[in-house]
Structure formats: structure tokens, C-alpha cells
Amino acid sequence: MTTQPRIKTTVVGSYPFPDWLGALPSEQAVIDATRVVIHTQEQAGIDLVCDGEFSRFDVNHPETNGMIEYFVRPMAGMRTAITFDELVAYRAQRGMGFRTRPPAVVEGAVGAGTLDLPHACARSRRLTTRPFKFTLTGPHMLAKSVIDKHYRSVPDLAMAIGDALADQVRHLDADVVQVDEANLPGSPDEWQWAAAAINRVLDDPGGYGDRGRVIM
């Protein structure tokens, strides 16, 4: 009788972006790179595989590999054209040293817009028969990265982004959903509203069921 390990192995999520994919990006190239990453994990005996996050990379946004842009720019309520005055104000903010440009400006109520995480998830899910983990950037990080001219409150914006992400999560074909919050360790005093926004994503009763949840 084969028993499953109580503690399963996995990887953080993102993989180094291969040069050849950046030189010749296409839907098929993303699939090929993802297949290599997943197969490497399977060969190593990883229990819970993930896709390397290649579909989110953007060579035009090297500071964070286009990760933030991937999530916020398709959302409703976001403006992507940034004025010079907005750039100057953004660069003067504390905690934004890792970026020189905002990914977007919030000008209206945030919604899912054209964001389609289920498509990216399904594309990777088809490449493995192992348990699959899908990762996404969390509402705390996303809310703090944009310029907010609508909510005028980062916690309120984070809640709205959390709701938009929850709409996506309920449709994901993944065994585990991982929320990445890289900015939160540097802002521990924001934990209460950050936790509330993250819970908006992961505690959605609309279909999440018994799937695993991870916060990084």
C-alpha cells in the first residue's frame, strides 16, 4: 500500500526567464518553456508542481519582470498611460525604490476587467498529471504598487483588488492556490488590512472548496 507524504514538496513558483523565450515570444513558446519547467520538477520528484510563471514576463518591465503589470493592467478602473507629474510623485514615495514607474493609475472602481487567470492556469494544468499549484500576486502588493486616484485609501483599494482576484480564483483548476505578498514583510504594521484583503481572495465561498491555500 502506497501512502502519500504528509508534508509535500513544492517550489516557490517563478523560474528564471529563458533568453530564447524573450527573443521569440509566442503562445507556443510559453507552453514549451512551461512544459520544460514542469517536467524538470516531475523528474526531481516534486509533489506539487507549478508553471514557472512564464506567461507573466514582460521584457518592457524588467524591474519586476512585468509581474505587477500582468495583474493590474487588464483590470477595470485602471489607466496605463502615466503622466510626468505622476511619475515624479510616484518616485518620491517611500517603499517604491524597487520601481521607477507605476504599473497603472486607479481612476474608477476596480473589477476583473479582461484579466483571465483561469486561461493561464488551464494552459499549464494540461501539461501535468501531478497535483498543480497556481500562484498569483496578492492584493497588498498590487494595491501599494499603483497610483490610487479613486479610493484614496490603500486598504480599501486592496479590498477591491481582493474581490477582483476572488472572482478569478473560484474558476481556477488548481489543487493549491498560492498568494505572493513580497512587500508585506517590509510593512508589518499593515498586517491587519493586508490579511483581510488576502482573505477576500482565499476565503471566497463561491467554489474554492477544499483546495489548499498558501501565502508567501
Language-model regions, residue ranges each:
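Domain-level signal for soluble alpha/beta catalytic cores
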Residues: 1-216
